[in-house]
UniProtKB/Swiss-Prot annotation:
Protein's UniProt name: Acyl-[acyl-carrier-protein]--UDP-N-acetylglucosamine O-acyltransferase
Superkingdom per UniProt: Bacteria
GO molecular function: acyl-[acyl-carrier-protein]-UDP-N-acetylglucosamine O-acyltransferase activity
Keywords: Acyltransferase, Cytoplasm, Lipid A biosynthesis, Lipid biosynthesis, Lipid metabolism, Repeat, Transferase
Top EC group: transferase
Single Gene Ontology BP annotation: lipid A biosynthetic process
Subunit structure: Homotrimer.
Assigned EC number: 2.3.1.129
Function: Involved in the biosynthesis of lipid A, a phosphorylated glycolipid that anchors the lipopolysaccharide to the outer membrane of the cell.
Length: 258
């Protein structure tokens, strides 16, 4: 463990073997940092934050600050960040409010680029990329392998589906289904994320089934949404991916981009 002499570490913080803390960083009470995690200079982890092993937290990140929510009245809440994440310069991650389970969660193997914001009560999965200057409002869920391009703003309580991609400078106000491409202000759908699906090793048969499901649900103007979902169940190959696609759309509370 290496702590720069100018860093300030609370006696209530716990640092594992191999942790490195750069100059002028501040580690507050209730913070745990896992093995071999690197914190650059001027990093602030305010309080009540768990960071896993093998993470790289770049200069001027601010983690574990109070939620930016007028309903927050000082309740004890947390941030949990998993293993092998990279947070670049000036990323901010806020603690949760007491709503839900009272935790802001970031999973494993994620890349969050410079100047991004992850607000209170967000839940991010694994292998996600969030590009420079994108901002997630409160209570957003982002599923595995999603890609959020630069300068994207996402409305609170929105869900971003697995293996989807959102184009740069988009404004997302409704749920983005899994496996799709979305872009624009306000964001609209532009078909499947074919390049991403191919790179992740989805079979031709699975991609073909998803294409047909997408066509029926989003390009059949004569069908109501519920009728389109039922038609997919009856006519499209019953794969786990198609079932997930249908379930995501059917359980949307904000409505989905289309």
């Amino acid at each position: 463990m290496t702590v720069h002499p100018t860093a300030i570490v609370s006696p209530d913080a716990r640092l594992a073997q191999g942790v490195e803390i750069g100059a002028y960083s501040v580690i507050g009470p209730g913070v745990t940092v896992g093995r071999n995690t690197f914190l650059g200079s001027h990093v602030v982890i305010e309080r009540d934050t768990d960071i896993g092993e093998g993470c790289r937290i770049s200069s001027f990140c601010s983690l574990g600050g109070d939620p930016q929510d007028l309903k927050y009245e000082g309740e004890k809440t947390r941030v949990i960040i998993g293993n092998y994440n990279v947070l670049r310069e000036y990323v901010t991650v806020n603690r949760a409010t007491s709503a839900d389970i009272g935790v802001t969660i970031i999973g494993d193997h994620n890349l969050i680029m410079a100047y991004c914001h992850v607000a209170h009560n967000c839940k991010l999965g694994n292998h996600i990329v969030i590009s420079n200057g994108s901002h997630l409002a409160g209570h957003i869920h982002v599923d595995d392998y999603a890609i959020i391009s630069g300068m994207v703003g996402i409305h609170q309580f929105t869900r971003i589906g697995a293996h989807s991609i959102i184009g740069g400078a988009s404004a997302v106000t409704q749920d983005v289904p899994p496996y799709v491409t979305a872009a624009g202000n306000h964001a609209k759908l532009y078909g499947l994320n074919l390049i991403g699906l191919e790179r992740r090793g989805f079979s031709k048969e699975t991609i073909s089934a998803l294409k047909e499901a997408y066509r029926i649900i989003f390009r059949s103007s004569s069908l109501r949404r519920e009728d389109a979902l039922e038609k997919v169940r009856q006519t499209v190959a019953d794969t786990p991916e198609v079932r997930h696609f249908i379930d995501f759309i059917q359980t949307s509370e904000r409505g989905v981009c289309h």
